[in-house]
Each structure stands twice: as structure tokens, then as C-alpha cells.
Amino acid sequence: MTSLDSAPPRLAPARPGGGRGGRLGERLLHAYTWLILLWLVLPIIVMIVFGFNDRVGKRNNTWNGFTLRWWGELFAIPDLTTALVNSLTIALLSTAVATTLGTLMGLALGRHTFRGRGGVELLMFANIAAPEVVLGASLLSLFITMGVPRGYLTILIAHIMFNISYVAVVVRARLAGFDSSVEEAARDLGAGPFTTFRLVTLPLILPGVLSGALLAFAMSIDEYVITTFNAGSTLTFPLWVFGATRVGVPPQVNVMATIIFVVGVLLALGNALLLRRRQI
Amino acid sequence: MTATGHTATGHTATGHTATGHTATGDAATGAPPAIELAGVAKDYHSRGRAVPAVSRIDLAIGPGEFFSLLGPSGCGKSTTLRMIAGFEEPTRGRILLQGRDVTAVPPNRRDVNLVFQSYALFPHLDVAGNVAFGLRRRGVKGRELRERVGTMLDLVELSELAERRPRELSGGQQQRVALARALVNRPAALLLDEPLGALDLKLRQTMQIQLKAIQREVGITFIYVTHDQGEALTMSDRIAVMNRGRVEQLASPREIYERPRTRFVAGFIGTSNLLRRTVRAVDAAGPGGRAMVVLDAGADERLSAPLHPQMGPLRTGDQVELTVRPEKIEMSATRPDGPCCALRGRIVEVVYLGTYTTYTVATHGGTEITVFWQNSTDSTNVAERGEEIWLSWLPEHSYVLPESADEEPSTPRSGGPDPGGPPEGDAPRRNGEPAAGAAAQTPTATAAHPVSP
Ligand SMILES: Nc1ncnc2c1ncn2[C@@H]1O[C@H](COP(=O)(O)OP(=O)(O)O)[C@@H](O)[C@H]1O
Ligand SMILES: [Mg+2]
């Protein structure tokens, strides 16, 4: 490593093997880094590759030749398609609602001092830190007590619930160092409170809001634990896939997951670019 | 302002107490002042305690006037400005814009614009977008919008940079965008909070001249907040010198400089010599019908000065302070004749400064007096260190101020709220004089350091 290579020369005679040892250490580090990266990426690669596997039988876990068949028959399994549509609409809706509410909550926490602010903050972090099993189970008992039938709506409510905190945390972080005198300048120049928010505050916190929305979408689309408690007979993509593991996951799942993954990566990259371009 | 009725020689006019207020609204035409503050006070609340930031301010600022609020950091200048703009609600008192009470009107519906100390430009809009912001809120669009923005950018010489974002501009350019963004709305008054504070000296001096020129051109009332006395003296028609949330003196720059009303003003504006003496006699009908105060002095020495016009009556034996500017003092080897003030002294320091030389002279009382001697003809010093000389000045070039009774030796210069709580409005006052505690502020860095006898 560089720190060893650039060690003071007076140490060199005492440790003749120092230079070579350094190179060895460096190689080990490289190897270790690649190993970790591989470990992280390998499942994804396998998932993508097996979307192109010309499967025989029920199990899709031995390579049998390349095909684009599953991409063509993407929506051939009606239940899976329904589950995917459920997942996507729930993710979009919960993201929209949670981003709106979470942004307002983040603004309140980051900009104002009010009675009970500490309590709200604690609640927000508790929501993030609490085990999903606990959240899911307690929500379920709440719904049962209130007599709300489990299904699409309860899944949506649950997703909004856990997403609000994530958005609020991200927006709040974005507000650190926010110069509120630009809002005063807008008021001074004749903008009312709402116009000021629309023309000044929102554009300035937009990168934070988008990051929060992205995070919320990603959290929602693959949520399993809380969803399974509150789904009733409704199925989402993760629930359907988990159910299918017992009988063999069809390659369509790989294709759908590949598409979700690629879209997710593109969105994240776009957001990062946006953040870099508008360093404010 | 030349209306104060006295000339450059410092010849004193009688009745000048009223002339300091000539620019406040025009009684003859009946036009209301552009801005009026009536008994305005502001307390901030921190940890359940009320902290007074502005104690009580009464002001009337005339249309088209260049008015400065001058004072040390923390004296309440920004708070006053923010109350006028509508960002702070006064705890007491009323604010009137062109005769209309706007105390409860939100900032977006007040016809004033503020140039923020930090500029507060919109980082996501370009220069033109920043300048157009206020006009767009008023529904100005299309050609008129483009023309007015273009004219304003020409005025502040930023036309070339119209498409730049604020972060791509230098400090001076950002400052001019902030100015243009406010001015383009043609407000009834423009409020400027230390607008040149972040610029370097050279740019600041250029901008002072430009600002004054722009103000003359657009004819809008300017209220200019600064802690820089040079800036205030250069640009203003009138100055309100603030200290601890009060106005200590409100007058023209010349009046403020030549007749500081309080010890604080004398110390804060320029360099002042302060001599602490006892009153020996009061001549109620001195030259020009003015009360002259004769002060204790040594043998063949003579100290007399007019009473400050706004100061109450004095009696023999009262402790007072005489103030005289360093450039009004003459030095000579022998005792000067005539009715001037004369003091003996020994030169302890000579500092050559190009256009003038500074002499520090120790009087027999022990007070050190600073003298500015213009290097107009002679290139040699008129006197050397250690020499015994006579100091003299005309009595009307000096003033007698009340001696600050309860002087605190180490008042923080910030003038922030002091932990014990500053004296509130019920402290004893004399003839409109601020409470003694307020007048007792330690002079700032610009003041000479008089040594008490
Ligand atoms: N928002 C605030 N809350 C509490 N105290 C404040 C606030 N703003 C200003 N102050 C206090 O009020 C006093 C006057 O402040 P300010 O008007 O900013 O002074 P200046 O502009 O003359 O430096 C200061 O002592 C300051 O600490
Ligand atoms: Mg200030």
C-alpha cells in the first residue's frame, strides 16, 4: 500500500522485505475488494442471466441455452402479472403520498422549533429502527381491531406509513445549511407564502425530495414482511415470487426483476447526476 | 445636507436643534414622510426571557432621502430594518409607509424592498430571473418585463452577465444583482442592510460612490444600515447613530461630526478628544447669546466651551466632559492671544501620515490630546517629541457634554444585551438625553483614549 511504500527511508534497512510485503498487501487488498464486489453482484448477474435460460422442466437453475422466449412471454402468467401491477401501483401511490407528507414533515422538523418536535423526531426514527415484523404485526392487529378488511388498501396504508419517515429523514438532511433568507427575499419581492414555497423552497429542496421519493419507491417495491401481514388475499410481486419458490420460480420473474433493477439503477444514476449538476 | 445652517469654518448657528430634522416630511406641502417609526420597540424572547433589541425608536424619513442607521454591531440596526420590511413584528409602536399604518401588513404587501446583507440571491435562477422575480409577482410580463429588467441591468452594469447563475459571479457582481433585484420594483423605499460589508475596501469605496449616484438617479428613499462611520458620512443626507437599541443622535453628517450630542457619538464617529473637567462658571449670555461654560484649568490656561444645545442647565462644580476634534486644534510655541481655549502640554508622540501628522500631547492634567496637523506647506514637523507647546482652539469648535456618571470600564464593543439587563426606559433622562447608562458606552476603536486626570 502507498503508506508502506512511502514509509521513511530510515526504516528500510530494518525491514528489507518491506517493499515486497507492501506489494503483497496491495494485491491481497485488490483481491479482497473484487471478491466482495463479486459477492454483491453475483446474485444479480445470475438473476439476469437466468432470464435468458432455455429452461427444461420446472426448475430454472441449470443453464440450458440462450433464449429470448421469456421476454416475449413476459405476461403469460396472469397471477404474476396482477401481482406485479399491484406492486407497481402500490409503490407509485405510496411514494407519491409519502413524499408529499414526508417532505412537509421534514420541512417542519428542519425549519421550525415547536412543542413536541423531539417527540415527532423520536417517533420517526423509531419507525425506521423498529423491526418490520413488529410493525407488520402491530398494524395487522390495528386493522383487525378496527375491522378493516385486509387487501390492497391496507398494503397501501402500510407502505405509506413506513415510507414517510424515510422521506422526512432525507428531506431534513437536505435542509442542513439551507439559507432561509432566500425565502425572505421572495416574500420581500411580493411572493405570498405559497408562491414562495413553489418558486423558491421547493426548487431548492427538490434534489432531497427526489432522493426521498426514490428511496421510498425502492423500499415499497420489494417490501415483504410488513406486506405479508396486511395483504389478506391480495398478492404483490415479492409475495407471489416467495410463494412460487416452492414449486419453481418461472423465468418471467427473472425478466421482471431485471427490468425493475435496471430502471432502479437508471433512476438512481439520474438523481445523482441531477444532484451534481445543481450543487446549490 | 447643507440645511444645518453653518459653514465649513464651523461657525455655529443658533437654533440648529430644529435644522437637523428638515428632511422629515414636508410640513409646507403636507406630503407625509416616506417612512415613519413611532415609538417602535422590539424584544426578542430567548429561553423565556425578553431581550430588548430595539428599546424605542422614533424616526421620520423624508421622500428621496438617503438615510443611514449607524452603530456598532448588535445595536439593533438590522432588527429596525427588518421591522420596516415586515419580517419582525414590533413589540410596541407603529410603522407608517407614506402615511399608511403597515405595522400588521406582511412583507409581500409592503412597498419597500430589502437588500440583504448576505444578498440572498435565488441560486436556481439566473441574473435576469432574479431581477425579474419581483416584477413577475406584480404581473408585469412580456416586453415591459424584458425592458425594465434590461434597463436595470444596464444601470448596474450587468447586462453581459444576464444568463449567469449567482454562484458564477464575484461578490461585487452578486451585490449589484441584489441591488438591481430590489430597485427594479421602484419601491417607496429601499432598505439596505450593510450591503457592502462583504466587499474589499477598494470595491467598497467604488460601490459607495455608485450607490449614491444610483440613488440620485432613481430618486428613491434609501435606508442604509452600516457600522462603518466613513460610509455613513460619505453617502447620507442624515444619519441616526444607534447604540443599545436607541437613537443617540439624528442629524446631518456634518452636525453629527461637529456636534456629537453624546459621549458615545463623539467616540464612535471619527476621533474625539474628551477632557473631563469641573464647571467653574456658567455664562448664560456668552458670545452670540449662547451659554458658555468655563471649566477648571491651570494658571494662564483657559478652557471654555458652549453648552451642547440639547443639554440641560449646568451648575458650578458639575463634572462634565469637553470634546474637541483633533483637526480643530492649533499648536504654538507661545501662549496664543485672543479669546481662544489654551492649554499647555508636552508632545509625547509624533506620527507622520503623509497628508497630515498626528501629535499626541500630554496636558498638565494628565489627559492625552490628539492633534491632526495638516502637512500643507512645510515638510518639517512644527514641533518635536518632548517639546513644551501650547494647544489652542476656538471655544465654538468644542462642546461640553454631560459626564457619564456610571461608566462601565469594559463594556463589550458589540453592545449586545448585557447580562444584568440594560437600563430600561424608566432611567432618569435630561432634556431628551438618553439614559446615562446608554451614553456611557465605551467609545469604539476609532476614538482617542483620553486619560482621566
Ligand atoms: N432572532 C433573534 N433572536 C434573539 N435575539 C436576536 C435575534 N436577532 C437579533 N437578536 C439580538 O438583538 C440585538 C440586535 O441585533 P441586530 O438588530 O441584528 O443588530 P445589528 O444589526 O445592529 O448588528 C443583538 O443583541 C442580537 O443578539
Ligand atoms: Mg446587522
Locate each region found by the language model:
Chain B
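Non-catalytic connector elements of ABC transporters
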Residues: 2-9, 272, 282-453
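The feature captures the beta-strand-to-loop junction immediately N-terminal to the Walker
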Residues: 70-72
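Helix-to-loop junction immediately C-terminal to a conserved catalytic motif
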Residues: 85
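Conserved coupling/switch loops of ABC nucleotide-binding domains, chiefly the family-specific signature
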Residues: 91-94, 144, 244, 276
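Conserved ABC transporter NBD signature motif
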Residues: 93-101
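ABC ATPase nucleotide-binding domains
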Residues: 107-267
